[in-house]
């Protein structure tokens, strides 16, 4: 397992967007997202300051690239920061 701060830095500097799903969940929590509910393989995560849920699901054991991109866009658009 990689620290959320190091993982986030790697995502910002690397074009590779494949990370283990469990690490992605840890990264979401580090930015203040909370797991709201699960339907089938889809998990819905919410943030107290954002009025838009983020739906994620694993692709095998990794997070899906487009969902990582959506997360990074939300962080940038809403000025979210990590709390460790």
List each language-model region with its residue ranges.
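A charge-rich, low-complexity, intrinsically flexible signal that marks solvent-exposed coils, linkers
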Residues: 1-22, 26, 30
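C-terminal structural segments of small proteins and small subunits
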Residues: 59-84
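Short alpha-helical segments used as structural interaction elements across diverse proteins
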Residues: 12, 34-36, 61-62
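Preference for short coil/turn "hinge" residues that link or interrupt alpha-helices
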Residues: 4, 12-14, 47-49, 56-59, ...
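A short, structured beta-strand/loop element
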Residues: 27-57
């Amino acid at each position: 397992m990689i620290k959320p701060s190091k993982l986030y830095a790697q995502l910002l500097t690397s074009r590779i967007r494949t990370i283990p799903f469990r690490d992605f969940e840890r990264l979401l929590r580090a930015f203040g997202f909370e797991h709201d509910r699960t339907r089938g393989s889809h998990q819905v995560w919410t943030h107290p300051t954002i009025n838009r849920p983020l739906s994620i699901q694993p692709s095998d054991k990794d997070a899906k690239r487009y969902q990582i991109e959506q997360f990074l866009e939300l962080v940038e658009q809403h000025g979210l920061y990590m709390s460790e």
